[in-house]
UniProtKB/Swiss-Prot annotation:
This is Hemoglobin subunit delta. One of its GO terms (cellular component) is hemoglobin complex. One of its GO terms (biological process) is hydrogen peroxide catabolic process. It comes from Ailuropoda melanoleuca (Giant panda). Pfam families: Globin.
Amino acid sequence: MVHLTGEEKAAVTGLWSKVNVDEVGGEALGRLLVVYPWTQRFFDSFGDLSTPDAVMNNPKVKAHGKKVLNSFSEGLKNLDNLKGTFVKLSELHCDKLHVDPENFKLLGNVLVCVLAHHFGKEFTPQVQAAYQKVVAGVANALAHKYH
C-alpha cells in the first residue's frame, strides 16, 4: 500500500496520463541494463546487449520495457492493493527467475530519472517525491514473495 495525499495521487496520475509507455518503458529498462550491467544476466534471450547502443536499440528490450510499464500502470490503478496486484509477478520473479529484489528498487529509480528527463520542469520536486513513494511501494510489492 502506498500512502499518497490527494494532491500526490493527482500529480502521479496526471503525469502518467502523458507517458508514452512504449518509449519510456524501453528507455527505462535499457538504462537499467546499461547502468547496472549485472542485471543483463536475466535477459540472455534478448540477443546483443554488448554496448549501450545495442541495448538501447534492442527491440526485445523495448518490448519488455513496454510490458514492464504496462504492469506499472496496473499498479497505479491499484495503489491500495499493490501486493495483490503484483502477487503473480512477485512469485515469477522469486521462484522461477530468481531476480534479486534489489533490482526492483534500481528499476524504480531509473524510471524516475527517465520521467524527469522526459518531463523536465513539469517533473517538479513534489512530483518526484510522489513517484519515489510509488516506485518504492511497487518494489516492495514485487519483493513480497521473498519475505
